[in-house]
Structure formats: structure tokens, C-alpha cells
Amino acid sequence: MPSVFLLFDIGNTNVKIGIADHDGVVASYVLPTDTHQTGDSLGLRLADVVRHAGFAPGDVTACVASSVVPSFNPLMRQACGRYFDRRLLLAPEDIAIPLENRYERPQEVGADRLVAAFAARRLWPAPRSIVSVDYGTATTFDCVQGEAYLGGLICPGVHSAAGALAAGTARLPRISLDVREDLPVVGRSTSMSLNHGFVFGFASMTEGLCHRLSAVLEAPMQVVATGGFASAIARVSNCFDHVRPDLLLEGLRILYMESGIKG
């Protein structure tokens, strides 16, 4: 019987779901972070996700999550317990993240940022410093030096920036980030102007901040892009050494396997 792990990146907007084996993440899905649903409705949807990936609910041997939405955690615990007969393991509450946390108030750091930083260090141990750039609800730059999480930078996310712009602008076209060109085009429509402005604007912001971070972090430094918009931004930027949209899910998988805890 196959053995797989069910991994959850519980964010403010979406829950990213990963199905992984001992070698890596084999499938990923996205559901909305709906705190008004029941544990049963969530559990049934998760069971369908597992079946869609070609597995049975009984194949799930562990459920592991990072969460920045505390009100969602009881729903996920109920769903995992009832539909997979597994307790939900939360990082860092149930599984410690083996990085020295140098934040002034360590409890303020989101679990997602710590897990992504941990994953970056485990996957690329060679560089002295590594920066994980996560394009999520916010765009975060998380800095690891040696085995220490130093902190980072937080900027607006692509969706949140687009939402703020739409809130103050009438008849704003939808931003798709569908840009095929390698250089920005002088837009001759509002849609093109927005898409090129966002893609190349966020790419330039990333390049500028990473250049400045390289002056304060110990060399050599590498940069990894992750999150939903990582591929779109990385296509037009040469500042990334690695692109791993599922970095956080991979971090949860490695964290669980290293912990020795049984689900």
C-alpha cells in the first residue's frame, strides 16, 4: 500500500495542499481559506483531492501544516482526524523548526516564513546566506545566514496591490500577469499597461531589494523564488538562483521526515 503525506500551507487567502511521498511533492492543489465551512465539508473535499491524485484516504500516513489563520486550524484538525484518522501536526507548535530565530519577538514570525526559510536552507546548504522571496498575499523576503533565521522584509503582494488599486479606480481590467515579452512594452491598452507594470514592477522591486540585501548579508548569497506568482516574475528576472513554487510544502515534508514524529 502506498504511503503519502498530506501537507497544508494555510494562508490568509488560500490553503495550498500538497501530496508527497518520501522523495518529494507529487501533486498540489489550492482551496480557498473558508472559515465558515464545517469540518465535514472540508474533510470531504480533502478526501476528493487525495483521490484525484490517485491515492486513497487510507494511504495518508501524516497530516502536516503551517498556518497563519488560527481560526481555521480546528476545522483542519477535525477533517484530518475524521477522514484520514490522523492528527494534524502544526509547525512549529507540534514540530519544532530547527533554525535559530533571531526575530526580536520570535512569536511574531509567521510559520509560513519560517518553514520556507528552513526549506531553502535544507535544499541549498552550500551558500552562506539564502533569501527566500515568497509571492503570496504579501511579498516576503526571508533571510537565512548559516543556521539562523535573521528576519526579512515584507512588501505588498501582487493580489493585494491589485486589490488596493481596484478599490480606488473605476472599471479597472483584471490583472492576469500574462506577459510573454522579456522586456516591458509601452502599453497601448489599460490591460497591457497593468500587466506589464505589475510583472516588471515586482521584478524590479525584487532585483533592487536583493541587490541591497547582498550588501548586508554574508557572501555567497543565493535567492529562491516561491509562491503563486514566482514563475511569472522569475521569467523576466535574472536575480533568482532557484525557482520552487512549492518550497513551503517541500519544507513541511522535510520537516516531518526529519522529526521522527509519527502522524
Curated annotation (Swiss-Prot):
GO biological process: coenzyme A biosynthetic process
NCBIfam families the UniProt entry points to: baf, PRK13321.1
InterPro entries named among the record's database cross-references: ATPase_NBD, Type_III_PanK
Main location, first listed in the record: cytoplasm
EC numbers: 2.7.1.33
Cofactor binding note: A monovalent cation. Ammonium or potassium.
Positions annotated to bind K(+): D134
Record gene name: coaX
Entry protein name: Type III pantothenate kinase
Organism of derivation: Oleidesulfovibrio alaskensis (strain ATCC BAA-1058 / DSM 17464 / G20)
Assembly and binders: Homodimer.
Required cofactor names: NH4(+); K(+)
